Amino acid sequence: MWAEKLLARYLEGVPFQIVLEHSRLVANTALDVCERLEMPLNNRVFIEEAALLHDIGVSRVNAPELGLHGDQPYITHGVLGRAILESEGYPLHALVCERHIGVGLTLADILKQNLPLPHRDMYPVSLAEEIICFADLFYSKKPDKLTHKKSVERVRKNLFAFGDEKLRVFEGWVVRFGV
């Protein structure tokens, strides 16, 4: 698929294998949601492509545990991915990159946490963005946990630290998308 080839232009070796495996797991979970929602084929194709590319921005971050030695903080991988995919001519896929962090980031989140990100809302808006964001919550890129799917309860516990609103968003997705 073209999305995997594009990913391979930005990552190589072990980092490529980690991100590809993670992205395939996210894509498969997202496609399961699409099946439950009986989404049309063209929507499913976009969701699969965007899920495969959602972490392309890690190619520019510093995450030695993943074999990544870029010069940017990990939290910026969403906006970096957006820039990459916009430059490649994929503006809708690019938005998925920017909006997939946690359950999404609001301007208030960015300011309150003093995150090194542009000052704007970065939360999923479209159904496709929400589905990919939801699916991504179940998987880690940590090599020793790469193929382990987190339980709904584990995701809840992870999100709890970020506040009730983040948990409410996730709970809404659980009801809407199933698991």
Regions inferred by a protein language model and the residue ranges of each:
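Generic N-terminal amphipathic, Lys/Arg-enriched alpha-helix
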Residues: 1-16
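Divalent metal-dependent catalytic cores for phosphoryl transfer on phosphate-bearing substrates
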Residues: 11, 39-152
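A short, charge-rich alpha-helical start-of-domain segment used by transcription regulators
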Residues: 17-22
